Every structure is written in structure tokens, then in C-alpha cells.
Regions:
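Short, small/polar-rich motifs associated with maturation and membrane association
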Residues: 1-172, 177-178, 183-186, 192
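Flexible glycine/acidic-rich beta-alpha junction loops that bind and position SAM and/or redox cofactors
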Residues: 197
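Non-catalytic nucleic-acid substrate-recognition regions in nucleic-acid-modifying enzymes
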Residues: 213
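A eukaryote-biased signal for short, well-structured alpha-helical docking elements
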Residues: 217-220
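The feature captures the catalytic groove of carbohydrate-active enzymes
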Residues: 295
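Extracellular/periplasmic, surface-exposed regions of secreted and cell-surface proteins
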Residues: 21-23, 173-179, 188-193, 201-204, ...
């Protein structure tokens, strides 16, 4: 579907009762949204998982990290480099089911014969669908200043009626070296807008519809044959065509990356990243008085408006030190802080009974349900979510044969009780590249052979921030402390003053290999994970609680398994096997 989101999976089991999502890091900006990018602006995608992910990005990396690097400017000697690409596609209706004809339906006496011959599945197909993509990039730069900017337009039509998405946007990546290379500034701005027209035609219903009925009626006002009071048979074509749906997604993301090279101490620098992301969603819907739902409910039109906004703020600052010592020793150390904050708000309104259909949702206050006190309205502000951490990590290698790394993070989350917000997490890994040993020099067919072992402890706070907020709600029956019910405004959440971090302990043993000048390569891993203090919403009695559930730390889970990947220049095979068991207490 044109409106389908991007789904990414990293093969890990992290929680028993929910799915953790991977953190997206775009050009060093954690918490990015891959849907804000176009594939032509992506330079590379890398994946981190297990201990390596937690060591760098902390608890938000519980399910792994997807690192995305976008294209940037280069030294073109001041000349402008222009690149244009396009793509045109048409989708086919594959795997269409075989439908009964009107004559076959009538012969089986399944239902009333209305005299038509309609393939309802085929009627929902947009046979004239056409999709196109255009991408224009401009690049120029010198040794000290480089700029990359791009613009794109995409129109994607699905095979279903009223299924379309149009995207356009652009981005600017720049890099400037100042003060004799003491300071490097890398600003970036990204904007994307996606307009959606999605009615999600009911193909399942199309397979149940009576094929002797026609979707069209030339004598009706709309040209469609609309009937009601038959729950198992209705005009799916009219439902899709008569509803007005317009959704608009907007992403705006400016960020600045500052790197200060401290020249009196070679190899030492300080880097500061500040980023802001604003995502807005607007939805406009209108069902006219001729729509089946309005006829069935004796209404004259239904208008719906919705708006939501999410703001992400990220700030990271860290010192890094890189030094190559005599004898093949190498050290890479980093220490700093990380801050992440999320805010959001939303609004929605429904109104009914309009004097005319043509104005649709643009004058939503004119529906009679508003003056009658029956219109639906809602608004809200999400609980502010904050994550703050201090971290340090070090990597050591000797002659690219022996490798050690260690990290520690002191992390605090606003999602937990005040006494349990801060926790310490750490990891350590070791590696041995056997292929670089002197006794392996005679094995010419061996390119790389490395054994690695790692152990790490990370936390998880992947749940709604509302569980630790004193949320209030209205228009609801509340259980009072004395055991009686009252229709009032009151607490909608049972706060747990003892809620704490979910903690994952993991060790991993793996082998990486490459043979015959890279023609055959792969890896093998054995892992074992134990998750303690699992976070789960459990049922609680009323009273003394005002609500029937509360988020608690309830138990533990253990998983272990094997995974392997074998690849050649043309083919790749992957196999995994894992066993998981849990215990609660």
C-alpha cells in the first residue's frame, strides 16, 4: 500500500509482553524517523544490536540501533554537481481470487437475483494506477566548505480505489571548517510533507457481495447504487468513492553538529549535537448525506477533523580521545552526556447534520449536533518524557589482533518513580582476530577469522510515560475509597511509587569469517539473555485502587539461541534458533 509505514526488525527478543522498537539514528541524531527520508538521500544503513548497541546509545537501544548516514557535500573545487533521477511504475493486480459470476450466483440460489453481473473485487481495483518519483540533488564545495541539497517529489498510487500518497520535500547538509580547523560546524535541515488519500476499500466484503447487484445507478444523485439495512451486503465501491479523506503528514527537523578540535592535545576533541524534530498530522474526513453510513443513521453528513503534534529535542555532548601508540597499540575513549525529551498534543472534533455537503469539513461548526450539544470533541497533551544520561566508554586494540572495550552509563528516566529513576548499566567485550596471527599466514584462502565475546547490562523503559503521571479524566464513573461509584472528574491512572527499571543481562559468543577473497563470508552467534523486573500492566482490586490495572515489575524471562549467516557474492542464507522461557514472582 502507498500509505504503508516502514517496518524494520532486528532478530532479538527483549520483552515478554510487548515489542520494543529499534532506535533510528540519522546522521548522529537519535530518535529520528526513517519515513522522513527519501531513499535517494541515504548513503548507508548499518545495524547495531546486543551489547554494542547498548554501550553507545543506552536503554533506548534495547531492541537494537539502525544507523542511517545521509549524503553530504564533497570537495568539487567550487563547481556545482547536479544529479537527477526518476522512476515510473505501474502496479498489477496479482493473486486476484476467482469470483462467482452473476449467472453462477443465481444458479446456486444463494440470494436475490437483481439481474446484473458484477465482479466486486475487480470493481475495487484502480487499473489506471501510475506512480512516479523525481529526485534532484545539487552538490558543491571546497576543502573548507561543502554543501549538499536535494529536492524530491513522489506520487504513489495503489491498486485499490482511492489509495494514493504524494510526498515532496528537501534537505540541506552542510559542513564548514573554521579557525584553522579548530571548529567544524555541520548544520542540517530536513523537511518532508506527505498527503494521503486512503479509504482502505473492503476487499473482504467484496468477496461476500451479491454479484447480481450493480455498484452503479445512473438515476441516483451520485451515480452509485447505495442500499442499507443489509449488514452482510453493501456497496463497497460507493463507500470508497463517496467518503472524502485527506491526511497530511509533516516533518521538520533542523539540527546542528559542532566539533571542536583541541589542538594542543592531539587526538582530543569535543563534539556537541543539538537537534529538534517537529512532526504534525492533520486528518480531514467527510461522509456526505448520500453515504451509506449517513442514510443508515438518518443524518445529513458527518465531518471529522483531527490534529496531533509531536516534538523531539535531543542534546548530546562528549569528549573523545583517539591515540595510536608505538608498538601497534590503539586507544579510543569517549565521555559525555545525552538528553532526550518528547512532548505532544492532539485535538479532534466530530459534527453531524449539515445543510449542504459541498463545504464539507471546512465549516465544521455549522453541523446541528454542535448546537444540540451532541458533537464530539477531544483534546489532550501528552506527558513530557525525559531521558538523561552520563556515559563513558573505551576501546583498545593491539595490532588489530586483540580488542577490548568497556562502557558504563548512569541513566535517569522520568517514566519511573522518583526513588528509582536512576540506574547504572555497563558492558564489556573482547575479541581475537586469529587470522592476523603469525601461525595463520600460510592459510591464503582465509581472509578474516575473529572470535568475540561480550557481556552487558542494559535497562528498558519502553512503555508509556503516562503510567507515572497523575492523570485526570472526566465523564466517567469512578470508584470512590468508600466503595461507591460516582460520575465525576478524577484520577485515570494508578501510579506505582515503586516502579523501577526493567533490566536485561546478556552475554554473546560469536565468530566472524571470510574466505576466498570475500567470495564466502558470514558469522555465527550463540547468545543468552535474562530480563529481570519485567514491566507489565497487572489487574488490581477496586477499591482501594481507583482503576483496575497498574504498571508493575512482576518477574523475569530468559532466552537463548543460535544464529548464523552465510553469504556469497550472489546469495545469502540465514538461520536462527532460540528458546525462551519465563518465570514470574
Amino acid at each position: 500500500k502507498p500509505d504503508s509505514g516502514v517496518v524494520s526488525q532486528i532478530k532479538v527478543i527483549k520483552r515478554l509482553f510487548s515489542i520494543c522498537e529499534q532506535i533510528i539514528v540519522i546522521d548522529g541524531f537519535p530518535g529520528g524517523d526513517i519515513r522522513s527520508l527519501t531513499q535517494d538521500d541515504i548513503k548507508s544503513i548499518d545495524v547495531l544490536k546486543d551489547a554494542s548497541a547498548g554501550a553507545i546509545y543506552g536503554t533506548r537501544a534495547a531492541a537494537g540501533v539502525i544507523l542511517i548516514t545521509t549524503k553530504s557535500g564533497s570537495d568539487t573545487n567550487g563547481k556545482v554537481r547536479l544529479t537527477y533521477s526518476n522512476e515510473f511504475t505501474k502496479k498489477q493486480n496479482y493473486n486476484a481470487p476467482e469470483m462467482l459470476s452473476g449467472r453462477e450466483y443465481a444458479e446456486h440460489n444463494i440470494g436475490t437475483d437483481y439481474g446484473s453481473d458484477t465482479n466486486w473485487w475487480d470493481e475495487l481495483i484502480n487499473k489506471g494506477n501510475f506512480s512516479q518519483k523525481h529526485h534532484l540533488a545539487l552538490e558543491m564545495g571546497t576543502e573548507k566548505a561543502q554543501v549538499y541539497t536535494s529536492f524530491f517529489y513522489e506520487k504513489n498510487q495503489g491498486i485499490a480505489l482511492q489509495d494514493e500518497r504524494q510526498d515532496y520535500g528537501g534537505r540541506v547538509n552542510a559542513s564548514f571548517k573554521l579557525f584553522d580547523d579548530w571548529l567544524e560546524v555541520r548544520p542540517a535541515v530536513d523537511y518532508r510533507q506527505a498527503a494521503r488519500n486512503n479509504h482502505y476499500p473492503n476487499f473482504q466484503q467484496a468477496m461476500r457481495n451479491n454479484p447480481t447487484r450493480s455498484p452503479y445507478d445512473p438515476d441516483s444523485e451520485t451515480g452509485y447504487n447505495v442500499w442499507i439495512n443489509e449488514s452482510l451486503d453493501y456497496n463497497v465501491v460507493a463507500d470508497a468513492m463517496l467518503e472524502d479523506y485527506y491526511g497530511l503528514d509533516k516533518w521538520f527537523k533542523p539540527e546542528v553538529n559542532l566539533k571542536l578540535n583541541i589542538k594542543p592535545i592531539p587526538g582530543l576533541n569535543y563534539q556537541q549535537v543539538v537537534g529538534y524534530e517537529n512532526r504534525q498530522w492533520e486528518l480531514h474526513q467527510y461522509w456526505p448525506s448520500t453515504h451509506r453510513s449517513e442514510i443508515d443513521n438518518s443524518r445529513k453528513g458527518h465531518a471529522h477533523l483531527a490534529f496531533s503534534k509531536t516534538e523531539n529535542l535531543t542534546s548530546e555532548g562528549y569528549f573523545s580521545y583517539v591515540k595510536d601508540f608505538k608498538g601497534g597499540h590503539n586507544l579510543n575513549a569517549t565521555a559525555g552526556y545525552s538528553y532526550f525529551e518528547v512532548n505532544g498534543e492532539n485535538f479532534g472534533m466530530d459534527n453531524y447534520n449539515f445543510s449542504v455537503d459541498g463545504i464539507k469539513y471546512w465549516d465544521i461548526g455549522q453541523g446541528s449536533y454542535l448546537t444540540d450539544g451532541k458533537a464530539g470533541m477531544s483534546s489532550g497533551k501528552s506527558v513530557t518524557e525525559r531521558l538523561f544520561s552520563f556515559f563513558a566508554r573505551a576501546n583498545y586494540s593491539y595490532q588489530d589482533k586483540y580488542m577490548l572495550s568497556a562502557s558504563i552509563r548512569h541513566e535517569g528516566s522520568s517514566k519511573f518513580a522518583a526513588d528509582n529513576r536512576w540506574a547504572n548499566f555497563w558492558s564489556a567485550t573482547a575479541g581475537w582476530r586469529i587470522s592476523n596471527e603469525e601461525f595463520m599466514k600460510d592459510f591464503d584462502w582465509l581472509d578474516d577469522l575473529k572470535i568475540r565475546f561480550g557481556y552487558g547490562v542494559t535497562g528498558n523503559n519502553d512503555f508509556s510515560a503516562t503510567y507515572m503521571a497523575n492523570m485526570l479524566g472526566s465523564d466517567t464513573n469512578w470508584m470512590m475509597p468508600n466503595g461507591t461509584w460516582a460520575y465525576s472528574y478524577g484520577k485515570s491512572q494508578n501510579v506505582n511509587p515503586n516502579l523501577g527499571w526493567e533490566e536485561k543481562k546478556e552475554w554473546n559468543l560469536g565468530v566472524d569469517y571470510s574466505f576466498f577473497e570475500g567470495r564466502l563470508y558470514g558469522k555465527f552467534d550463540y547468545y543468552r539473555r535474562e530480563v529481570d523486573n519485567l514491566l507489565f500492566s497487572v489487574k488490581v482490586p477496586q477499591p482501594p485502587y481507583t482503576q483496575g490495572s497498574q504498571m508493575q515489575n512482576i518477574g523475569s524471562m530468559e532466552s537463548k539461541g543460535l544464529s548464523s549467516v552465510l553469504s556469497t557474492a550472489r546469495r545469502s542464507w540465514a538461520r536462527s534458533e532460540n528458546r525462551t522461557f519465563g518465570r514470574a514472582f
